[in-house]
Amino acid sequence: PEQAQQAAQVMGAIQDDPNSRQVLNVVQRYAEAFSTLDAYDRGELVRPDGTPDLRVLDAAECRDVVRELAASQGVEGTLFGNERTEGGLEAAVAAVYQGFGGVDAYPSVEEKAANLLYLVVKDHPFSDGNKRIGSCLFLHFLARNGLLGKDGRSPITNGMLVALTLMV
C-alpha cells in the first residue's frame, strides 16, 4: 500500500510537470531500445541470424560504384575516389569475407555491409570521399543482396545513414 501511494504521488508529479512528462514519453517511446542496450551490457543480447550472403562483392565492382557516385556528384577528375595506396580497397573488401576454420567472421550480409562501411571510413583507402564512398558501398552491398527497399521503401533513412557513417 505504501509503495502504491508513493508511485501514485510520483505519477501525479510527473503529470503536473511538462519536463517530466516529456522525459517519461521519451522513455516509454524508446523502452525497447533501452531494454536491448541493457541486454547488451549484461552479455545477454542474442545475435540475430541475419541474411546469408547471396552475392559476393569484389573490388572491381566497388570501383564501378565509386565511379558512378563521382559522376552523380559531379566530382570526376578530382581527388574523390582516387585510391591512396595500391591494394587498400581490396584489403577492405577481402576483410569482410575473412574467417577461420571455415566459419565466416561476418556470416550475414548485414554484418559484411556494416564492416565494409567501417573499414572504408576508418582505413581511408581513398584520397577524398571515404565517408560518402563507404556509405554508398554499404547501401550497394545491401541492395545487391535484396535487403534495401524490398517493399519500395528503404529501411535506412538519410539521417540514419549519416548517423551510422559519422559514428564510425
Role assignments for model-derived ranges:
Residues P1-V168:
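FIC/Doc superfamily catalytic core
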